[in-house]
Curated annotation (Swiss-Prot):
Modified residues (N6-succinyllysine): K54
UniProt GO molecular function: proton transmembrane transporter activity
Species name: Dugong dugon (Dugong)
Pfam families linked: ATP-synt_8 (PF00895)
Membrane topology summary: Single-pass membrane protein
Protein name: ATP synthase F(0) complex subunit 8
Localization, UniProt: Mitochondrion membrane
Regions that span the bilayer: 8-24
Predominant location: mitochondrion
PTM annotation (N6-acetyllysine): residues: K54, K57
Encoding gene (name): MT-ATP8
């Protein structure tokens, strides 16, 4: 079984790390960052129908009447 032969592990792991390091560097160097990030004001919408109480009522175990 070749997995149990640990003589090639160091070379395999080292080559993998070097390859990933080079790939990540090229990916990060090719990324173009935006020049100016200006804040955009969000559009606020007013809803005409408010929440109805039957949908916002919470039932906590301690607030229920005792039986």
């Amino acid at each position: 079984m070749p997995q149990l032969d640990t003589t090639t592990w160091f070379i395999t792991i080292l080559s993998m790390l070097i390859t990933l390091f080079i790939l990540f560097q090229t990916k990060l160097l090719n990324y173009t960052y935006p020049l100016n990030a200006l804040p955009i004001s969000p559009n606020v919408t007013n809803h005409l129908t408010p929440w109805k109480m039957k949908w916002t009522k919470t039932y906590l175990p301690l607030s229920l009447p005792l039986q």
